[in-house]
């Protein structure tokens, strides 16, 4: 590894810019890539919402849910099936695309069709995975592990920048608090901004997840997504991560914590108001 360079204070995925002092941007989409038709339906709806509100949106979805609670749970269509769908969303609908990778060998192939490679929280310290993602030259979004202190993310980011890639996002998604429960410590947002120098994202939907809370699957408390999202945006973050679905109660994964697509635009309008107030009062963002 080479000596780390400083992470970029602003990173751009297509026309969507992330910076702690910039207007809020959004990462949104369904938890799992269910089918081409479903993915295009949600992506088109998000593109229209972004256009109406004047807010940048990156489409997210997972080609493989590799850490399901049960081996019997649906995992997704796989990387081979996902790549042409990712490319179609990016090229035809016009949204930048994010997906998560779980193995170093997936990074280069996924980077062919997406703008942002995401490192899952459970894998945030896996050096080989971080270096492989960084080597693609794509933006790398690292979710802070539920077991990790926010100040420890500086070491994680340094692994990525040591590969010569300054394009890093860091995401807060809650910390383990007893069994099957996560809590969100809003102090983590300015701490990660200070210790990493990277744009900070708040994952409002996984933060209300109840890991393994339903026995063979995870539960969630969807009603608290707007509460935590407002709190985080009031701090002055670069972006929010919100999973959304037309029918979350029948989604194959993470339904209990996804926001119904019909409610998504209203939530974004509120968050944009909070963001404008936070950054207007501080002059240049609060973190």
Swiss-Prot record:
Pathway: Carbohydrate biosynthesis; 3-deoxy-D-manno-octulosonate biosynthesis; 3-deoxy-D-manno-octulosonate from D-ribulose 5-phosphate: step 2/3; Bacterial outer membrane biogenesis; lipopolysaccharide biosynthesis. One of its GO terms (molecular function) is 3-deoxy-8-phosphooctulonate synthase activity. Pfam families: DAHP_synth_1. GO terms for biological process: keto-3-deoxy-D-manno-octulosonic acid biosynthetic process. It catalyses: D-arabinose 5-phosphate + phosphoenolpyruvate + H2O = 3-deoxy-alpha-D-manno-2-octulosonate-8-phosphate + phosphate. The keyword Oxidoreductase does not apply. InterPro entries: Aldolase_TIM, DAHP1/KDSA, KDO8P_synthase. GO terms for cellular component: cytoplasm. SUPFAM superfamilies: Aldolase. It comes from the Bacteria. Keywords: Cytoplasm, Lipopolysaccharide biosynthesis, Transferase. It is found in: Cytoplasm. Its EC number is 2.5.1.55. Belongs to the KdsA family. This is 2-dehydro-3-deoxyphosphooctonate aldolase.
